[in-house]
Amino acid sequence: MVNDTIADMLTGIRNANLAKHKVARVKATKITRCLANVLKEEGLIQNFEEIENNLQNELLISLKYKGKKRQPIITALKRISKPGLRGYANHKELPRVLGGLGIAILSTSSGIMTDQTARHKGCGGEVLCYIW
């Protein structure tokens, strides 16, 4: 059985958004911390903090909503590179999500970053997910 912590994180955020929860609880790993940091820098989530449990650490991700009807800032999340089929792109082939309205998150040799940052630095890598 393959554990895909990135897909678990995206699913946790998606489910919490649909249920209009204030926070989403996800498993805390190095990559989920980096992904949460990128989401915070892009303004897609309010904040995140790590909670230490006896068995396993968790990340509490505070979600962002807009308007009186509490529409989520994150409308969709899509996992691209999966354990069974990895997806890579060099700096010339980096995808533009919804014509620049969304972001693609990449894992590069310089760390985890958005497509815009990777384009600016001129480095490619593994395309982890699309968020818009």
Swiss-Prot record:
Keyword Ribosomal protein in annotation: yes
One GO term describing the cellular component: ribonucleoprotein complex
GO molecular function: rRNA binding; structural constituent of ribosome
Domain of life: Eukaryota
InterPro entries linked: Ribosomal_uS8, Ribosomal_uS8_CS, Ribosomal_uS8_sf
Transmembrane segments: none
Location of the protein in the cell: Plastid, Cyanelle
One family name in Pfam for this protein: Ribosomal_S8
An annotated GO BP: translation
Keyword vocabulary terms for this entry: Cyanelle, Plastid, Ribonucleoprotein, Ribosomal protein, RNA-binding, rRNA-binding
Keyword Ubl conjugation part of the UniProt annotation: no
Biological function: One of the primary rRNA binding proteins, it binds directly to 16S rRNA central domain where it helps coordinate assembly of the platform of the 30S subunit.
Oligomeric and partner information: Part of the 30S ribosomal subunit.
Family from the record: Belongs to the universal ribosomal protein uS8 family.
Name of protein: Small ribosomal subunit protein uS8c
Gene encoding the protein: rps8
